[in-house]
Amino acid sequence: MKIRGRALVYGDKIDTDVIIPAKYLVYTDPALLGQHAMEPLDPEFPKKAKGAVLVAGRAFGMGSSREQAALALKGAGVLAVVAESFARIFFRNAINVGLPVLQAPGIREKVKDGDEVELDVEGGIVRNITTGEVIVGKPLRGLPLEILKAGGLLNYLKNSR
């Protein structure tokens, strides 16, 4: 599974309250959630997110266990999230809603805002097309990869009957 897009680079410890503030949790439509993604940190994020790969530092998605965080990013048009590390529950929620995620230690030093990047989720490789740099991350394998390939957990369960 390969994904290519423009990098939007953010910092460490971006929690789910920043990804989608609690006041929007009454909504379930990913497109509506996406209009408010990252609002406290970057109010312009929804305008920049379509076709982008979100690159972040350590502990991305920490905080409360809200599936809407991954849905908001997907609804905003984010193609994938690459981070130095993830909160475990966000990582699984992203896979369950069909949002590709890849852990790649050191990614923030090697990718700048606006760089063109290509992810190989199965191989755990990030290529910075702009600079030629290759970053080796942790490959996604097994059931999480199968769920992601199916487009999320619900699609996986429908197709496995």
From Swiss-Prot:
SUPFAM superfamilies: LeuD/IlvD-like. InterPro entries: Aconitase/3IPM_dehydase_swvl, AconitaseA/IPMdHydase_ssu_swvl, IPMI_Swivel, LeuD, LeuD_type2/HacB/DmdB. GO terms for molecular function: 3-isopropylmalate dehydratase activity. Its EC number is 4.2.1.33. It catalyses: (2R,3S)-3-isopropylmalate = (2S)-2-isopropylmalate. Pathway: Amino-acid biosynthesis; L-leucine biosynthesis; L-leucine from 3-methyl-2-oxobutanoate: step 2/4. Keywords: Amino-acid biosynthesis, Branched-chain amino acid biosynthesis, Leucine biosynthesis, Lyase. One of its GO terms (biological process) is L-leucine biosynthetic process. Belongs to the LeuD family. LeuD type 2 subfamily. NCBIfam families: LEUD_arch. Heterodimer of LeuC and LeuD. PANTHER family: 3-ISOPROPYLMALATE DEHYDRATASE SMALL SUBUNIT 1, 3-ISOPROPYLMALATE DEHYDRATASE SMALL SUBUNIT 2-RELATED-RELATED. Catalyzes the isomerization between 2-isopropylmalate and 3-isopropylmalate, via the formation of 2-isopropylmaleate. This is 3-isopropylmalate dehydratase small subunit.
